[in-house]
């Protein structure tokens, strides 16, 4: 039960990590699709910067450039707005005065005019100082966003690369060992694998030597030796055995016992195969001898039949010649006819003999097949 719960917890953690990675990848993809900053935003920022420079150039940048170049800006001529006083004879004695005259204006009015002028000048100065600060801030923001977009792209590539490597490592470790292992555990497993490989190589060498029969191993002596080692720990210390060495020795003993049992079974199977081969070879030899004897008997019978038939045909021809004392021409014609008949009879009789031989050979083959199909005696 605890193993299954641990596996479930691990699976849940892995699913969560994968979901978080997918969300990050989706956010980065959206950011890349937008291109960091869209085109209309960039156009808006550049337009604002151009307008700011156009507004500040005549009041701020142009005088600064002229000052750097050593040229003084042209001074605007001051216009005196105060009019000269009107002569009393011109009708100015009625008390009409110009408002610009400093002597006739009330002191409170003068203070209000001065305050208004100072406020207008202060507002203009603040506006002229805020515009360059605003432009500089916009430029810095633009540069910051550009560098940030590039940095995010590079970081995303690195993260994807390392995430892929981590996924590969995790999958390999999980598939091989069924869980997550640290570097120390992996190194320990590698060392154990090397030790097992060396032990297996030694086992194979000993098995080859046992198979060759050069160095036979006495299992009884090995069992006694192992019992002595288990009983006396001092003997172990004297020999220099450890737990790992004991395990290797036990594994070797078990492997040797199994090998001996397998070799015995293999020898038994070999003996059975040899016996079967010998019995089958003996039966084949007997069948061949029988067939050869039957064929020799058939040939002898054929040889005996042929001379008997020839003697019969010759005796018949001689008797006929004796019984017929005729003319030479008639005798010759009759002899030719008789010889033809004898040849035809002999040919017919020979064909019958061949057919009998074939039938006999077919019967023998059938008998052989029947014998081979019968179960062999072990």
UniProtKB/Swiss-Prot annotation:
Ranges of biased composition (kind: Acidic residues): 163-172, 281-304, 345-354
UniProt keyword annotation of Coiled coil present: yes
Coiled-coil parts of chain: 180-212
Biased composition (Gly residues): 90-103
Annotated transmembrane regions: 42-62, 127-147
Gene Ontology cellular component annotations, sorted alphabetically: endoplasmic reticulum; endoplasmic reticulum membrane; intracellular membrane-bounded organelle; neuron projection; neuronal cell body; synapse
Subcellular compartments: Endoplasmic reticulum membrane
Pfam family, one: RIC3
Name assigned to this protein: Resistance to inhibitors of cholinesterase protein 3
């Amino acid at each position: 039960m605890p193993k299954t719960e641990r596996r479930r917890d691990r699976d849940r953690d892995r699913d969560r990590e994968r979901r978080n990675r997918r969300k990050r990848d989706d956010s980065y993809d959206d950011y890349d699709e937008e291109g960091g900053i869209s085109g209309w935003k960039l156009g808006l920022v550049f337009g604002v910067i151009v307008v700011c420079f156009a507004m500040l150039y005549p009041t701020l940048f142009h005088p600064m450039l002229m000052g750097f170049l050593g040229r003084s800006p042209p001074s605007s001529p001051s216009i005196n707005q105060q009019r000269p006083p009107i002569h009393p004879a011109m009708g100015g004695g009625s008390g009409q005065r110009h408002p610009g005259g400093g002597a006739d204006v009330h002191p409170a009015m003068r203070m209000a005019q001065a305050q208004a002028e100072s406020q207008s000048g202060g507002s203009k100065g603040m506006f002229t100082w805020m515009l360059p600060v605003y432009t500089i801030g916009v430029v810095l923001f633009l540069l910051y966003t550009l560098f940030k977009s590039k940095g995010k792209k590079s970081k995303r590539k690195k993260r994807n690369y390392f995430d892929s490597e981590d996924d590969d490592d995790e999958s390999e470790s999980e598939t091989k060992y069924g869980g997550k292992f640290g570097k120390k555990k992996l190194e320990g497993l590698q060392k154990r694998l090397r030790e097992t490989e060396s032990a297996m190589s030694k086992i194979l060498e000993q098995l080859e030597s046992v198979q060759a029969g050069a160095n036979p191993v006495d299992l009884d002596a090995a069992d006694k030796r192992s019992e002595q080692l288990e009983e006396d720990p001092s003997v172990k210390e004297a020999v220099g055995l450890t737990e790992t060495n004991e395990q290797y020795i036990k594994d070797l003993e078990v492997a040797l016992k199994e090998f001996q049992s397998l070799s015995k079974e293999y020898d038994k199977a070999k003996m059975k195969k040899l016996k079967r081969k010998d019995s089958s070879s003996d039966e084949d030899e007997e069948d061949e001898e029988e067939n050869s004897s039957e064929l020799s008997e058939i040939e002898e019978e054929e040889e005996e039949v042929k001379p008997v038939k020839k003697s019969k045909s010759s005796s018949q021809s001689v008797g006929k010649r004796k019984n017929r004392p005729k003319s030479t021409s008639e005798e010759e014609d009759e002899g030719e006819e008789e010889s033809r008949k004898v040849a035809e009879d002999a040919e017919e009789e020979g064909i019958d003999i061949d057919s009998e031989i074939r039938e006999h050979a077919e019967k023998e083959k059938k008998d052989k097949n029947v014998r081979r199909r019968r179960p062999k005696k072990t």
